[in-house]
Regions:
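Extended alpha-helical scaffolding segments used for macromolecular assembly and cargo binding
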Residues: 1-117, 124, 383-394, 398, ...
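Structural signature of tandem alpha-helical TPR/SEL1-like repeats
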Residues: 95-99, 133-140, 264, 380-386
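Amphipathic alpha-helical segments of tetratricopeptide repeats
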Residues: 2, 37-38, 56-64, 99-110, ...
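C-terminal non-catalytic interaction modules
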Residues: 93, 100-103, 344, 353-454
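Eukaryotic tandem repeat interaction scaffolds
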Residues: 306, 326-334, 338-362
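Tandem amphipathic alpha-helical repeat scaffolds
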Residues: 18, 35-41, 74-88, 113-133, ...
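Residue signature of alpha-solenoid helical repeat architecture, marking inter-repeat boundaries
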Residues: 7, 14, 27, 43, ...
Length: 454
């Protein structure tokens, strides 16, 4: 069949795999189930899982122990990549697949296959918000990539470290790592990136760097690199990477305060992710559509949709961006004057903010929202100032200039009530003048108007 129908071998390896399975020819059957799984992943992750599980069923039929271990290792790694897309990046089944793959590497001395298994485990820990473990794995990946002097592995290792640093709120260091990853990316290596990590770093890294740039105070650069990520995703024709680009683009627009852009793009993002059954990104897009609805005055619908997305996300085991989602919920509640609800959601995050192993990229904004809640609900100026001051300390430590600007705006509102407007505007003016772009974004427009009232 391989010789008679070469086009089927290439385009539909599952047919060949089925024939070899029926003929009880285990080794070639497994080889073709693996090919079928890897090919299907670019179109349908669910189909990929089915093909790979068929291959795993045949593993006991291989007599040679080294070949048996290597075959299972390749299948388990690909299965982990496929399950990430269908079940969510941080489900237990994903961890089991990568852990088994790594165990087989170590038992059989197959060191050359260690990198993708460890990258998979880094992903699992990262999405679980276990950043101490994620950071250690990212450092291991970088050391391994340097020792191998492998450019593809270096791209992915810098990605892993950059993503982890971002989540920890170390934005300048994250940007350095992400820029390094982007600079090493080669279009000619696109297939190799997908084989190793089941995602396209040309898309994913740019998307994360866009968020990082916004926090660092470069909202226009953030939008530009986000557009680059979308172009890379369109060119790759890889659905999972397109889902990443679509949903993180929504997040960048949200950070820039562009409600209409989020509302206008969210439906298409949700439909695309639902079509391909990318549960993690469906949840993310629902959260952002809910935020947009709340901003547009549909408070009850918006809050309910953010909660729905958050529940879907947590059901996959993911805790990454949990503080961000709760922050969006609290923001919607504050605007709806539901201050008790806002404090309830913020309380879920507040207890974790002092732990260096937890998510801290949104810590300054959480403190600002706590201050806003006390300022608006009870005019408790002392408590509001306490949280605004804590937020400013964090924002300055993290070099999160965009969040520092928001906190200074909140401080201006506080000082207006205390009849100390000049002090608040002086502080705001210093931050405002440090920006070199983004003057048409909501926060900077508001800052300019506040300063002009002086």
């Amino acid at each position: 069949m391989e010789d008679k129908f070469p086009s089927i071998v290439v385009s539909q390896p599952e047919i060949v795999a089925h024939h070899f399975t029926e003929a009880d020819m285990v080794e070639p059957a497994i080889n073709y189930w693996l090919k079928a799984g890897n090919l299907a992943l670019s179109r349908s992750a669910n189909a990929a899982v089915g093909h790979l599980e068929q291959g795993l069923k045949l593993i006991p039929g291989i007599d040679n122990p080294m070949l048996r271990n290597k075959s299972e290792l390749l299948l388990q790694t690909s299965l982990g990549n496929s399950l990430r897309a269908t079940k969510g990046w941080s489900t237990d089944s994903v961890k089991l697949a990568y852990t088994r793959a790594l165990q087989l590497c170590r038992e059989s001395g197959l060191d050359e296959h260690t990198f993708p298994a460890v990258f998979g485990l880094w992903t699992w820990n990262f999405l679980r918000a276990a950043f101490r473990e994620a950071h250690a794995l990212a450092e291991y990946l970088l050391n391994t990539a340097e020792n191998l002097d492998d450019s593809v592995c270096k791209v992915l290792a810098h990605e892993a470290l950059g993503f982890t640093l971002f989540a920890q709120g170390k934005f300048a260091a994250a940007h350095t790592e992400l820029e390094r990853s982007i600079s090493l990316c080669e279009d000619s290596e696109a297939a190799a990136y997908l084989d190793l990590s089941a995602q396209d770093p040309r898309v994913h890294v740019r998307s994360y760097d866009a968020m990082t740039l916004w926090f660092l105070g470069f909202p226009d650069q953030a939008l530009r690199i986000c557009a680059e990520a979308r172009r890379c995703a369109d060119a790759s024709q890889h659905p999972f990477s397109e889902a990443i680009a679509r949903t993180i683009s929504l997040r960048v627009h949200q950070l820039r305060g562009e409600t209409a852009a989020v509302a206008g793009q969210a439906n298409a993002a949700i439909a695309f992710c639902e079509e391909h059954e990318f549960v993690h990104y469906v949840a993310m897009a629902l959260i952002l559509r809910g935020w947009a609805r709340a901003q547009q005055g549909e408070f009850e619908k918006g809050i309910a949709e953010i909660q729905e997305g958050l529940e879907k996300e947590r059901a996959t085991g993911a805790l990454l961006f949990d503080s961000y989602s709760l922050g969006l919920l609290a923001d919607a509640c504050i605007k709806n004057k539901s201050y008790g609800q806002a404090l309830e959601f913020l309380g879920q995050v507040q207890s974790r903010l002092d732990d260096e192993n937890t998510e801290r990229f949104y810590a300054a904004e959480i403190y600002r929202l706590l201050g806003e809640t006390y300022l608006r609900s009870s005019h408790d100026l002392d408590q509001a100032e306490h949280y605004f001051s804590k937020g400013l300390t964090v924002a300055r430590e993290q070099k999160a200039k965009s969040l520092e600007l928001r906190l200074c705006l909140s401080m201006c509102d506080l000082y207006d009530l205390r009849k100390g407007a000049d002090k608040g505007r002086s502080q705001l003016g210093d931050v405002y003048r440090s920006f070199s772009e983004g003057f048409d974004t909501a926060d900077l427009v508001r800052a300019k108007a506040t300063l002009e009232r002086a």
